[in-house]
Each structure stands twice: as C-alpha cells, then as structure tokens.
C-alpha cells in the first residue's frame, strides 16, 4: 500500500504544465496614453491645417453659441471659435510645459550632481537649502517671482515655473551620484583632467537619467497645470494670449450664462493630456523599479 502511494506521488503528470507565453511588446506599456498624447500634440502643431476659423477673431454676432456645424465646439463669451482655439492654444500650453520642464531638469541635474560630488559639509548645506525651498508652497513662489518679473509672457512664465519645480529631481540625482561618484571610470576621468560638466554629461547623466525620467514627465504635467491655475486665477498670461488655461478663465461668465461647452471642452483636453502624461510617467517609474529589482 505504501509503495503504491509512493508510485502515485512519483507519477504526477507534467503534460498539463503550460509554458509561459512570450509577453507582447505592448503589454505593460502606456500605448493608448502615448497614442492619444501624440495625436493631441500633432494636431496642435498642425493647427493651421485643422482650424476652421481665426481663433483670435471676435464674432460678436455669435457669442456663447452652442456647438453646431459651423462652430464645432461652440463659441466663447467673446465670440471666438473654441474648436480653433483648442488647437491654437494647445501649442502654447504644451510649449510652456516643455520649456518649464527643460529649465527645471537642467537646474536639478546641475545642483543634484554638484551636491553629490561635493564635500560632506557643502553637500549638507545644499540639501538643507533644497529642503527649505521644497517646504515653501510652489504656487506662492510662482506668484512672488512673477510679480517681481512684471507682466507675464510665455518665456517669463516658463522660467518662473521651471525654477520652482527642480527640488524633487535634484534630491534623486544627488542620491544616484553619491552611489557612483567613486567608481573607477569617474576617478579615471578626473585623473585625465575632465571637468565637472564633462564628467556630468559623459558619465553621470547616462547612469541616473532612467531614474528621473518619470519625474521629468510628471514635471511637464505639473507645469501645464500651474499655467492653467495661474490663468484661471487671472494672474497668468493675458486673456488675449490663447491657452487652455486662459480659456478656462472665462468659466465664471460661462456659468452665469449656462454655456457649459466653454468650460467642458478646454477642461477635457487639459485633463486628457494630464492623464496621458501621468500614465506615461507611472510606466517609466515601473520600468525603472523593475530594472533596479533585477540587480
């Protein structure tokens, strides 16, 4: 009886074990978000080919008009065609997000890398300053700096948003640099007389860029939201500069007249773009965590 049980235990069938199928290239990747984001960006870049009317023209005979065949997305309180404004203004919103992210990433990489290779006392000083800067509300800093710089324009607003959103990336860069600063290739580059920026570009950036990629993507999202928030509050770009944020600044008048499309359509495009960037950023973070867990 015992031998029979051992025979049964040893003769388990293995034919039913299904080999793991190969993972599809698109699985685990934000394909839909990337496709939607690319489509929105391309449409904004090709706005002149898509626009049905002049986005700056104020047709006072057709203000607050609901969507129809002539005005696909309706008109705003000043009679401007919202369909044309979406694509025309989207370029500026995306441009501000991109410029602000480039500025914040550059500052973060330089400050974080310098802190990572600096002596302990200087590293401590830089990190304490970074933490103090990080503790101040970002929106308050943006408003203060913009007030100092004067009237807002695309460049000044991008600069102000950029110089107030570098701290989180800088801390990650500093941590990564401190882990590799005593590597043989870094020491060899120093011995050969390479300067800080050459070592940073040639040796340090390739090692930590994947770790901050998701934060860079998230910064684009944050910059676009900041621009929209400032425009909504009436302290961003002038009303004649069309962006998704400036379109939303007319929401108070739209609510009074029941013109829901003035709020819904720009808000929908802004939220869709932000969600796509969020999904892409989360995918970058998961990819980075997966790579780090394999080591």
Regions found by a protein language model. Give the residues of each.
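Transmembrane alpha-helical segments of polytopic membrane transport and secretion proteins
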Residues: 1-38, 279-295
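Periplasmic/extracellular loop-to-transmembrane helix junction in inner-membrane transport proteins
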Residues: 18-23, 53-101, 250-267
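Generic alpha-helical transmembrane segments of integral inner-membrane proteins
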Residues: 34-46, 98, 102-110, 114, ...
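Transmembrane-helix boundary motif in ABC transporter permease subunits
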Residues: 48-50, 96-130, 143
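Generic hydrophobic transmembrane alpha-helix motif, especially the helices
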Residues: 72, 76, 116-117, 122-179, ...
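Glycine-rich helix-loop "coupling/hinge" segments at transmembrane-helix boundaries
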Residues: 147-149, 177, 226-265, 269
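C-terminal transmembrane helix and the adjacent membrane-cytosol boundary/short C-terminal tail
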Residues: 164, 217-220, 259-295
